[in-house]
């Protein structure tokens, strides 16, 4: 059994991946204005890309990140342009269609790689501090998550982020001033899909890789976005980190089977106490 300090460090790294997932989902909800239930499938896609690279002797997390992001972006743009944009005014159709895509992906993954969980070698430690092992994938995951959160926060507070903010607030005005709203929507969908795949590729060495592995991260990212709000990106980041820590510590102290139940209980309690989410409680921040 690993020491508690190791569990806490791994929880931070897990939370960083959850933060990436939640950031991508927040982009889709804010700009495209749909609930994308296929978001978890892109997370799974990233994990399988990392697995395929590892089985071919490429053990670089950076290579996995770039390849997973590129493939997921292409699929995301295709899905956003060919399906999401045409039916986005019908939320039920979007939900059913995106869920159908996720199920289709799970079935294809099962045909290609089987239903049994796969694993990736954790590799040599990046560093060891007082017996606590720091893995490359975890460090990169944390750095990427911090960089993306910082970039998104900066973008939304600068003129360069005006198109996204304007589309999120009023699409008619955005179209009236000459913005290609439809193009921005499907490119945003592609970018968010790429972020989800990066999260999956970075977390792949620490989890069992299976066709349905994206379901729990999808649920947790939805919870994070609902609780934190779509515009409070740093609130979103820290809440995701907290969920990662809570997940790992509860699995360590209790049992893995209780971990996600405890997470759902805590967040449901949070939403009961603050129905409008954490963002409404901190109007002056980020």
Predicted stretch roles:
Residues 16, 25-47, 89-94, 163, ...:
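Short, non-helical or kinked segments that cap or interrupt transmembrane helices
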Residues 14, 133-209, 233-238:
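Helix-loop-helix "hairpin" substructures at the membrane interface of multi-pass membrane proteins
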Residues 9, 31-78:
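Membrane-embedded helix boundary and interhelical linker motif in transport proteins
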Residues 89, 112, 151, 169-183, ...:
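Cytosolic-side transmembrane-helix boundaries in multi-pass membrane proteins
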Residues 25, 58-101, 108, 239-243, ...:
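Alpha-helical transmembrane segments within multi-pass membrane transporters and channels
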């Amino acid at each position: 059994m690993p020491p508690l300090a190791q569990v806490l460090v791994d929880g931070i790294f897990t939370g960083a991946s959850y933060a990436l997932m939640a950031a991508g989902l927040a982009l889709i909800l804010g700009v495209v204005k749909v609930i994308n239930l296929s978001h978890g499938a892109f997370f799974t896609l990233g994990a399988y890309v990392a697995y395929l690279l590892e089985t071919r002797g490429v053990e670089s997390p950076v290579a996995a990140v770039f390849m997973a992001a590129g493939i997921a972006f292409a699929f995301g743009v295709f899905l956003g342009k060919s399906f999401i944009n045409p039916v986005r005014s019908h939320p039920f159709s979007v939900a059913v269609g995106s869920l159908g895509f996720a199920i289709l992906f799970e079935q294809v993954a099962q045909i290609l790689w089987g239903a049994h969980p796969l694993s990736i070698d954790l590799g040599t430690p990046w560093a060891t501090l007082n017996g606590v092992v720091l893995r490359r994938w975890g460090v990169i995951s944390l750095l990427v998550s911090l960089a993306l959160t910082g970039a998104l926060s900066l973008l939304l507070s600068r003129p360069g982020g005006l198109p996204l903010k304007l589309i999120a607030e009023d699409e008619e005005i955005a179209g009236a001033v000459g913005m290609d709203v439809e193009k921005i929507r499907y490119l945003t969908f592609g970018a968010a899909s790429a972020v989800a795949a990066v999260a999956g590729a970075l977390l792949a060495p620490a989890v069992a890789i299976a066709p349905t592995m994206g379901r729990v991260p999808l649920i947790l990212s939805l919870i994070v976005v609902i609780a934190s709000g779509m515009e409070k990106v740093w609130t979103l980041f820290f809440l995701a980190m907290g969920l990662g820590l809570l997940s790992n510590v509860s699995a360590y102290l209790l049992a893995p089977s209780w971990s996600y139940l405890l997470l759902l209980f805590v967040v449901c309690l949070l939403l009961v106490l603050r129905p409008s989410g954490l963002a409404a409680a901190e109007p002056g921040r980020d």
